[in-house]
Regions:
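Sec-dependent N-terminal signal peptides
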Residues: 4-16
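Positively charged n-region of N-terminal signal peptides that target proteins for export
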Residues: 1-4, 142
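Subset of outer-membrane beta-barrel
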Residues: 21-362
Length: 362
């Protein structure tokens, strides 16, 4: 009863957080970057998977658990232009307190030449974002688990800097018989504590997300569906002022899409579709489509791969290597690399090898 009450309070908090915030501009948008190859390959949305992969856990803290204890994950992404970002993640489980994780994220936007209003050079400067995340997860029962993250955020752009805090809260359900996993996540609830400029507070990039995945029983497939921005219906960036709408060649009037077309476009902008194929125990292939990215980044004059992403992950004796690529626009295809180590598994293998060697010698 106590566990169900705790879960109910948590879900109510998620709903309230989503209801109480509205869309619009925000600060600290680097928090929404994908810091794991599996996340990138599956469309850069929330994923809900009950397995041994530690690389995505900081985005879904409810699945931080004992099976990932003593794991390290490193990520590097070659983004656009001079921009690169990286992260390092570690998790450990304490029997009574639960499972804890820590991650540091760094985004470097490169160096720039400063200019004054007269066009004179003022010297070079850099721009960087950093976030330190502390996560916690705990199983309430074999089927239910919860988790939370606390994020310390720092941004420095030339002489301007900002500091803020944000939290994530998540709850997950797992059915081992159906191989079904569900997660609800309230993400980036927080605010600036120190603003870039005086009296100009901006909100963090809040999102309310839901994800499900299911491993099919007789084929090596797992499908993923994730929903984002559940607190807001209209996802069209331009609204009625869209400068890319077609015009009638005779009257030069704007051709607005039908209400039905607008409805389904908005509906699918909230959904990411992903598929994992596991042809062998050590290999996973991923493919996904993000309709919102496609609509925002597509080129009208020709077909585009915008919104598609793909990748793979190798898992060999406690060592995971992952690669993913995501398409935004021609020439804008970030590459993401992941390396993850489970030190408990590596230690276990080392002990087994020593035992076999001793057995042969005796």
């Amino acid at each position: 009863m106590r566990k169900h009450f705790t879960l109910g309070i948590f879900l109510l908090f998620c709903w309230f957080a989503g209801y109480s915030q509205t869309g619009g501009g925000s600060v600290y948008n680097f928090l929404d970057f994908s810091y794991a190859s599996r996340l990138t390959a599956l469309g850069n949305g929330l994923i809900s998977v009950h397995d041994d992969d530690p690389t995505f856990l900081i985005t879904n803290p409810s699945y931080i658990g004992s099976r990932h204890s003593n794991s390290l994950a490193l990520n590097f992404t070659n983004y656009f232009g001079q921009t690169n970002y990286a992260s390092a993640f570690y998790t450990y489980t304490f029997p009574k307190a639960g499972s804890f994780a820590a991650e540091v994220r760094y985004v470097g936007y490169g160096t720039f030449q400063g200019m004054d209003e007269a066009g004179l050079e003022t010297g070079r400067f850099s721009a960087n974002d950093i976030a330190l995340t502390l996560g916690w997860g705990r199983e309430l029962s074999p089927n239910f688990s919860i988790g939370a993250n606390l994020k310390f955020i720092f941004c420095g752009y030339e002489m301007y800097n900002s500091f803020g805090l944000a939290v994530d809260v998540a709850g997950s359900y797992y059915n081992p018989d159906k191989r079904l996993s569900l997660t609800l996540l309230a993400k980036n609830i927080g605010s600036e504590l120190k603003t870039f400029t005086p009296d100009n507070f901006e909100r963090t990039p809040f999102d309310l997300q839901f994800a499900l995945s299911q491993r099919l029983e007789h084929v090596p497939f797992r499908y993923h569906i994730s929903l984002h921005h559940l607190y807001r219906w209209n996802m069209n960036y331009y609204g009625d002022d869209n400068p890319f709408l077609e015009t009638d060649g005779m009257t030069n009037e704007i051709i607005y899409p039908s209400k039905v077309s607008q409805f389904f476009d908005n509906f699918f902008r909230h959904i990411n579709f992903g598929l994992e194929i596991e042809p062998a125990k050590f290999l996973s292939l991923q493919l996904a489509y993000n309709h919102n990215i496609h609509q925002e980044m597509k080129i009208l004059a020709r077909r585009s791969m915008a919104g598609f992403s793909y990748g793979f992950m190798l898992n060999i004796k406690g060592v995971r290597f992952g690669f993913a690529r995501q398409h935004f626009a021609p020439g804008a295809t970030p590459n993401c690399f992941n390396l993850a180590l489970n030190f408990n598994e590596l230690s276990k293998q080392h002990q087994e090898k020593k035992q076999k060697k001793l057995t042969r010698e005796t």
